[in-house]
Amino acid sequence: MKKLVLSFIIALMGISSTAFAQSKITGTIVEEANGKAIPFVNVGLFRQADSVFVSGAASDDKGRFELLAPNGDYRLQVSAIGFQTFEQLLTVKGNQDLGKLKLSEGAMKLSEVVIAEKRPLFAVEGEKTMYNVAEDPSIQTGTASDALQNAPGVEVDVEGNITLRGTSSVEVWINDKPSHMTAENLKTYIQTMPANSIDRVEVITNPSARYGSNADGIINIVTNAKIQKNEFFSFGVNASTQPYIGPWMSYVWSNEKLTVNAYINGGFSNWKGYNKVEQSLFTDEGILANHERDSSNYSSKNYNAGGYFSIDYEIDTANSLNLWFSCWPSWGGGTNYTATQREEFLPNPLNTAYIESSDAYNRNFFANGGLYYMHKFDNKGHNLSVSVNGMGWGGGNGGDVKRQFTAPIEYTHLFRQENSSSSMGAEAEIVYNRPYSENGEISVGYTVGYDPEKQYLKTDSLVGEDWVNDVYRSYKAKFTNLNNEAFITVQHKFGGLTVKPGIRFVSELVTGEYPYTFPGDTTNYDFRKPFFSVRPSLHLSYRTESMHNFKLSYTRRIAAPEAEQLSRFPLYHMDSYSTGNPDLERVYTNSLEAGWTKYWNSFGSVGLSAYYRGKSNEVNTIQLSEYHWLYDRIVQYSYPVNVGKSHTTGLEYNMMYRPSGFFNLRFYANLYDSYIYTEYNGQPYEFDKWSYSFRLNMWAKLWNKLEVTASGYYSSPTQTLFSERKGWYGINAGLRADFFDRKMSVYVNANDIFNWNSFGNSNNSPSVQSTSNYKFNSRSVAVGVTFRFGKMELEQRARQGEGESGGSPQGMGGM
């Protein structure tokens, strides 16, 4: 075994040394007319045999550049705005200096002032913060992943996971429409697509009425290239010490009209952790009723598989069609051991102790599919699109549970549960975009959706030798949500000022049905509640020639309560119970945000934003205690309520130091005040708490092959109604390397290096006081390898002409 391991290490070292056996090619870029050095020029090295990109760099402020490549025959290409493209054939046999490479002046030379006015590196227009990738010479030789690292607020870790402002609740769109990609497909896309095929990246942190998305933000990648010919196959495996292992494969075939995309994956994970809870229940008079301590250890083993298939067909220059389908089943099980000690003081003194052990299973299934059709009336953004989506999911869990009591007497209680839920919904949307001038565009759309859900719970207890149904812990229910939505937005540019008002109309019908009730219970728990809301938005932005960007936005969102929150049907758990609240009203949210950002091409950016999010009728869960005959003791009872009013007021600071396209250091900080006011039983309750968080990220790409990332973060305690979440923090670091002309990539990522991650909550309601601490195996090392085969030939399109999304005007994005 030792010899085998030694041989493997020697072989790996040999591969690494071969992959990094590089020769150095240097030179200086100068103007042919006067010999003046040309800074920040794109220099690329391509294989003569097949034109595959091998290495690239940008010249420094003195025109000097340096490339690394294995020995071989290459074509050197130098390009810069205002100059003719320079090409030279090279045979590399060792380090060599090419001396001065002279560029001739081209026919289309733009002054620096004009470039800054029309296409700055960073800009804010309406709700969008844009990173104009096509104007960044230092990133042209990288990948889409490299470009995203430079978009304000966007982070991509070494595994390819994308976050925005530190949250993963973000949708990635490509050419103004949702990508519908799986996580692994998206990772492959951004890690292989050349950065020079991207026109710009648009970041939307406060979506307008145009978007029905529930995500915290949207990242829209707008390309300036069309896949002309492509046959691409990739496969790999990801693993971690948690443990987790997941193999996957992806295949893409394309020609000028048709693209076929197929993906399959599998996975196994094993999560372990522990949880500790202390809880005290009080009467309305403030007298202690009981005190309970729980300590749990659990493990969960899960398997998953999945597949994705899509077809994109360009019928002609004016019509295109996209079809897709995905399916993701998962299954597994877990064990749990909980030790409980409870001291009861009211209504009767009693000490209870037991150990609960369970062996559970779970099965889940998710599938969705749809089609997207677009008709382009011209190549200036005038288009009509229709989309239809269907989604179905189902699953359940259950198992046997044993409670071994040691007090007040020794006995065993055995019960089993079977819980399932399922849904089969659909949604259709039609959107019409029409530019009414070179500086303005109007968009209108209509969406209709239907989302039903069925729930089922069955509980049986062992009585003697027979399993007897527990009718109070068994039920069936059906919920439906029917929504109709329409929106209209207008965007107009007045020089550097962009104005975008919009409005969205939403009609919802929420229903619930309970076909069975408890013995002797004649209550009708069915409900049917309609809701209607109007959601206006306004986004203003202004930018100067010196790249000062100002923005001001207002949005109003109105959310109807969830179906389960409206039900009065009591859900009896083993030691507590809960109900909904049919008197819940809609939640109104008014958001106001103002910001300033200054961008420098050679430094990066500094930004400051102030925001206010005020809510009325926010839904929170209140926890009470009361005696219930089913338990014959005082237990916890919870139900949702509308908080009287709440608001969050904060200040965000972000700084990005970016001396080149392959290195950046970013600091993000958020300081905010959370205020909540409500009344319960005629008694007012008021909470006011300041919280803060910050994150420091470093990303670098070395020798065009090796990525290095590191991040540290901290979030202080936060407050909600009668509840406080404890602070959390951690440090991550990672490496990713490309080998063999990006045919193979390997990453290593260390998560929560010092094992600091733990989570906790405390509750301090009038009747329930509790603390809980939760810890899982967060410290881990993740590794992965990806192999890629194929070639992608890109046909660049003129920036002023047609884009894949329908050629919307620059900065408008078809929105």
Feature map (PLM): residue ranges:
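Short, acidic, small-residue-rich periplasmic hinge/interaction motif at the N-terminus
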Residues: 42-46, 79-83, 93-137, 157-159, ...
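Surface-exposed extracellular loop regions of Gram-negative outer-membrane beta-barrel proteins
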Residues: 509-511, 546-591, 612-634, 638, ...
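Outer membrane beta-barrel strand-and-loop segments of large Gram-negative receptors
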Residues: 416, 425-429, 471-475, 579-581, ...
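Outer-membrane beta-barrel translocator/receptor signature
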Residues: 212-219, 227-278, 301-305
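Short, acidic Ser/Thr/Gly-rich low-complexity loop/linker segments typical of extracellular
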Residues: 48-64
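Conserved C-terminal beta-signal and adjacent last beta-strands/turns
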Residues: 538, 687-815
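Short acidic/polar hinge/loop motifs at secondary-structure boundaries
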Residues: 68, 144, 177-205
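N-terminal periplasmic accessory domains that precede
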Residues: 97-102, 144-147, 186-188, 202-203, ...
